[in-house]
Design a protein with these regions (language model features):
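Extended glycan-interaction surfaces of carbohydrate-active proteins
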Residues: 7-88, 126-196
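Short, contiguous, pocket-lining structural segments
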Residues: 85-99, 117, 121, 153
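Well-ordered alpha-helical scaffold segments within catalytic/enzyme domains
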Residues: 95-113, 160-170, 196
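Extended, well-ordered alpha-helical scaffold segments
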Residues: 1, 100, 104, 111-129, ...
């Protein structure tokens, strides 16, 4: 269970689950991961792609350490949530999860199936995800549950909340305004992390 406290927000327990695994969003939580001794694995990603565009070996050491730790615990949901070496509430991941739950309701209604449990879960998600909006910085942030720390990285994934449609026009307007400014001084549109 990735949401044992029923907050409506699920955790990712490995950066690979996010879909943007070598993002600087994960640098701080990953730096806290102690690499297991005598770790062994073989990389192929840096053989077919320019190694400068791939994570460093120390990053991969941490990825594999987390993966091995999850495997040792047999992926037991009760164990891994509490003891995972990496446990982050990711706004991008939760935005996609929220949107998928909303889409699921449409399907359930189409087939005249009960959607009350999911509707209640969505209400909880929409309420609690707003706790991750920083009014001063005017953006959402991820939260490192393991180390109890906010992750303030200006990631393009923070805008996925617009896709989830939380029906908060004030926040939506702020995000749209910020999104329009995201590329003003950049060579490429919508870089995953906004340069300073």
């Amino acid at each position: 269970n990735r949401d044992p406290k029923k907050t409506g927000l699920v955790s990712i327990l490995h950066p690979w689950e996010s879909g943007y695994d070598n993002s600087s969003l994960w640098d701080e939580p990953m730096n806290k991961v102690k690499i297991e001794k005598n770790i062994q694995y073989k990389r192929a990603d840096n053989k077919v792609i320019n190694p400068e565009h791939r994570p460093l070996n120390i990053d991969y050491d941490r990825y594999v350490t987390i993966k091995n730790d999850l495997r040792k615990k047999k992926y037991d949901p009760k164990k891994i949530f509490k003891t995972s070496l990496f446990n982050v509430v990711d706004i991008g991941f939760n935005s996609i999860f929220l949107k998928s739950n909303k889409d699921l309701i449409i399907l359930l209604k189409k087939f005249n199936l009960d959607s009350s449990t999911i509707i209640n879960y969505i209400k909880i998600t929409e309420k609690n995800i707003l706790k991750y909006f920083d009014k001063k910085k005017q953006t959402f942030f991820c939260f490192d549950l393991r180390n109890k720390k906010k992750i303030f990285i200006p990631s393009i994934t923070n805008y996925l909340i617009l896709y989830a449609d939380i029906k908060n026009s004030k926040i939506n307007d702020i995000l749209i305004k910020n999104l329009k400014k995201h590329n003003l001084k950049e060579k490429y549109f919508f870089s995953s992390i906004k340069p300073n």
